[in-house]
Amino acid sequence: MSEEKLTQDPTAEEEQTETADQQESADVNWEQEAAHWKAQAEEHQNRMLRTMADMENLRRRVRKEQEDLAKYASQKVVEELLPILDNFERALAADKESMTVESLLTGVDMVYRQMVQVFDKEGLVAIAAKGQPFDPHVHQAVMQTQDPAFESGVVVEELQKGYMFKDRVVRPAMVKVNE
């Protein structure tokens, strides 16, 4: 019987060793699997943090661009008005004794035309008033009159020009309206 025990013991011992090896191998596999998933999670977290930082940088850049756009929005118009300013300065620097009323009026007319060109180019348009039906969106009635030459509700006189910039009223025309 002791021989039987000896014979059985090596087999049992081998089985225990195999079981221990399998257990150890399974533990190693789980550890490797856990390490793999931990690395994946860290990589995803790092990617998420970089994306969040990129989004914040984008927000800052867009905010800065919007501020700059608002700050320098009128730069183009200012650049176009500079030659007009130069012409006024030249007129003021001209010899006053040799200047005639006619030459002064000619110079002012030239500057006026130059200014109108700049405004036209930018989209500023005078609002039609006299003889037009009164429109509260573009006209501001400051006086009323009774003139048989005009129909009721028609603008008789323009007291101050009104202007539209593209599709917005910048200043309504001040008008006298027929009752």
UniProtKB/Swiss-Prot annotation:
SUPFAM superfamilies, per the entry: Coiled-coil domain of nucleotide exchange factor GrpE (SSF58014), Head domain of nucleotide exchange factor GrpE (SSF51064)
Lineage of producing organism: Bacteria, Bacillati, Bacillota, Bacilli, Bacillales
GO CC annotation: cytoplasm
Keyword vocabulary terms for this entry: Chaperone, Cytoplasm, Stress response
Compartment(s) where it occurs, according to its Swiss-Prot or TrEMBL record: Cytoplasm
Family to which the UniProt record says this protein belongs: Belongs to the GrpE family.
Biased composition (Basic and acidic residues): 33-45
Presence of keyword Cytoplasm: yes
Alphabetical list of Pfam families matching this protein: GrpE
Major localisation: cytoplasm
Family matches, as InterPro entries: GrpE, GrpE_coiled_coil, GrpE_head
GO molecular function terms attached to this record: adenyl-nucleotide exchange factor activity; protein homodimerization activity; protein-folding chaperone binding; unfolded protein binding
Key word Cytoplasm present: yes
Protein name: Protein GrpE
GO biological process, one term: protein folding
Region of interest (Disordered), residue spans: 1-45
Quaternary structure note: Homodimer.
Function comment: Participates actively in the response to hyperosmotic and heat shock by preventing the aggregation of stress-denatured proteins, in association with DnaK and GrpE. It is the nucleotide exchange factor for DnaK and may function as a thermosensor. Unfolded proteins bind initially to DnaJ; upon interaction with the DnaJ-bound protein, DnaK hydrolyzes its bound ATP, resulting in the formation of a stable complex. GrpE releases ADP from DnaK; ATP binding to DnaK triggers the release of the substrate protein, thus completing the reaction cycle.
NCBIfam families reported in the protein's UniProt record: PRK14140.1 (NF010738)
